[in-house]
UniProtKB/Swiss-Prot annotation:
This is Uncharacterized MCM-type protein MJECL13. Keywords: ATP-binding, Cell cycle, DNA replication, DNA-binding, Nucleotide-binding, Plasmid, Transcription, Transcription regulation. One of its GO terms (biological process) is DNA replication. Residues 271-472 form the MCM domain. PROSITE patterns: MCM_1 (PS00847), MCM_2 (PS50051). GO terms for cellular component: MCM complex. It comes from the Archaea. SMART domains: MCM.
Length: 602
């Protein structure tokens, strides 16, 4: 970290012309044309690369330096906007400092009243409060009115009139913004050996609340006295910017060699099938389409503006559904729970009222739903009707309420992979009855699943011999080493042999989640034609259309493509038709009829 004093007037003289050009050519073209009081984030890393080194250093030298630079940039931006005929205000946030300025949490006490940047994981978060950010003042002498915008949590409430110099009186609060308190823990294992540095308190003002996850925080270390006469201070980080880190940036380490190998194997046309066999070995599930669908769900657990892919597996008792779900739960960002043994508060746990510097308010701590970044695997889904019903809002609204009054909610943006046995004698499917009537789940929940797959345990000599052989090999192998052909395979890519095992699969999934393929006009036409044809002869709804779109994007993402093509759509259609023919086929009418999902009153 920089710990130097800079003459701000010299910094202004050195950079004024250069900064005006940057604002005019780079900043203003990217502003929203309608928003007033827009928050504009300026990357200090970018400014440093453009030659504003001393300007960046001066923001780090002291809290005064930070606010002087920020206010100066706001002033220059306002001037340039007025020259172009726009009369609006923007709130500048200086963030994204270069990596060399990043510190560990144990170093925070050494940077009081300075800007810091650090990574951490949220272990506790308050429900959002509101903080007044714009006050209205009136001068008792001359009667003039002034609006004052407070951009930080600590300020001097003495406001003076610009005309008569008299002290102005507070009249009203004009505007509010969300306020949250976060307790953040160091990502490194060594953090457990330290006290106050281990769990710093972060005060954050922003539109979007945070409850769980790995975050990168840029903020100012402030000292708050425990009482008016106390010489003991609490250290608070006043957050300037909070950036949520994706799974790929926090839970797994991808080397350059890993990325090269991932891109190489992605060129194979059968890469999805290969990875699906590693994710769920055919010994656990012999349905190749089901294995492929579950793999695709891991790669695209949540798609912005489209939604998530939810899957229900209904397995006979001979299928080890728990082993399948636990295996998938080991992928970074995923979680596994058995809903039959779960308590309601474990889904999302609120604290009792907790006292702190600000007073008493509820905080969220614990809960498997908010901290799941990918797919939540739920076993025995039809064994706890109360919790299953409570989860319906997580399926539909992407939130989960944590109290009876539904006042407090936590995010639930993960996808769901649920599994259960059929509610029949001996947990075996009755061939004389429809699948939908044997699941034992109400239509309220069933309609939230994009795909429902029955998995039967049918005796097969070759498969049973393979299962027995694998079990014997595991017993013989005392060192618990991986078995080639079962636990890993070697694939040929341009004459090079690359090992694909579960560790490689996890890295592939994490990397592919960063890909955002686009949908072309040809793809839209193909999906529309399929939907029109299905509506002519069968009964499906827009939900199935949306599922095909999500699956098509997920297939393209699994192949690391920039655009979705017709082959991806074909694979998506094959997957959804596999589900529709097995679960919602009406033999009396001879058609696919999804209305069967809504008739189930179990």
């Amino acid at each position: 970290m920089i710990n130097m004093c800079y003459n701000f007037e010299n910094v202004k003289k050195a950079y004024e012309d250069q900064l005006k050009n940057y604002i005019k050519n780079s900043l203003i073209p990217n502003l929203s044309s309608h928003a007033n009081n827009e928050v504009v984030k300026i990357s200090m890393k970018k400014l440093a690369n453009l030659g504003f080194g001393y300007l960046v250093d001066s923001t780090l030298s002291s809290i005064t330096g930070y606010y002087k630079v920020r206010d100066w940039i706001e002033e220059l931006l306002k001037e340039e906007l007025q020259k172009s005929g726009e009369n609006k205000c923007c709130n500048i946030v200086l963030c994204d400092y270069p990596e060399e300025f990043e510190i560990s949490m144990r170093e925070i006490p050494y940077y009081v009243n300075k800007v810091v940047k650090f990574n951490g994981v949220i272990i506790s978060a308050s429900y959002p409060c509101v903080l007044s950010k714009k006050h209205l003042y009136i001068c008792p002498k001359c009667g003039r009115i002034k609006e004052v915008y407070f951009s930080e949590l600590f300020w001097d409430d003495k406001v003076f009139c610009e005309f008569c110099g008299g002290k102005m009186e507070f009249a009203n609060v004009m505007d509010y913004e969300n306020f949250q308190e976060l307790v953040v823990q160091d990502l490194s294992d060594e953090s457990e050996y330290y006290g106050i540095e281990k769990n710093p308190i972060v005060w954050y003002c922003g539109a979007k609340p945070y409850y769980f996850g790995h975050v990168k925080i840029t903020g100012i270390v402030r000292e708050v006295p425990r009482s008016s006469k106390s010489r003991i201070y609490e250290l608070i980080v006043q957050a300037i910017n909070v950036e949520k880190l994706g799974v790929e940036k926090s839970l797994i380490n991808l080397t350059e060699e890993d990325v090269k190998n991932i891109k190489k194997v992605a060129k194979r046309g059968d890469i999805i099938d290969i990875l699906a066999d590693i994710l769920i070995p055919p010994l656990l599930c012999d349905d190749a389409i089901v294995r492929k669908a579950i793999l695709i769900q891991q790669i695209a657990p949540y798609l912005e503006d489209i939604g998530k892919i939810n899957i229900l597996l209904v397995t006979e008792v001979g299928i080890d559904k728990t082993a399948i779900l636990k295996r998938i739960g080991n992928i970074p960002g995923n979680n596994f729970i058995n809903i039959a043994a779960l308590k309601e508060e474990e889904l999302a746990t609120p604290y009792d009222k907790r006292s702190n510097i600000l007073g008493k308010f509820y905080t969220v701590c614990g809960g498997v739903i908010p901290r799941t970044l990918g797919v939540l695997c739920i076993d025995d889904f039809n064994e706890n009707n109360k919790l299953s019903t409570k989860l319906s809002e997580a399926f539909e609204r992407n939130v989960l309420t944590t109290n009876k009054g539904s006042f407090y909610c936590v995010p639930a943006e993960c996808s769901f992979l649920c599994a259960c046995y059929p509610k029949t004698k001996f947990r075996k499917f009755d061939q004389k009855k429809s699948i939908i009537k044997q699941i034992g789940i109400s239509s309220i929940l069933l309609k939230n699943f994009d795909l429902i797959f029955p998995i039967r345990d049918i005796p097969d000599k070759d498969r049973d011999e393979e299962v027995a052989k694998y079990i014997f090999l595991k017993y013989i192998n005392s060192d618990n080493e991986e078995i080639e052909g079962y636990d890993y395979v070697f694939v040929d890519v341009g004459g090079e042999k690359i090992k694909i095992d579960f560790e490689f699969l996890k890295k592939y999934v994490v990397y592919s989640r960063q890909i955002t393929p686009k949908i072309t006009d040809e793809v839209i036409e193909k999906i529309s034609n399929w939907y029109d044809e299905m509506r002519k002869n069968h009964y499906i709804t827009a939900k199935q259309l949306n599922t095909v779109i999500k699956l098509s994007i997920a297939v393209a993402r699994a192949k690391l493509k920039e655009c979705v093509d017709e082959d991806d759509v074909k694979e998506a259609i094959d997957i959804i038709m596999h589900y529709l023919k097995q679960v919602v086929y009406n033999p009396k009418k001879g058609i696919i009829d999804v209305i069967l999902l809504y008739k189930n009153k179990t």
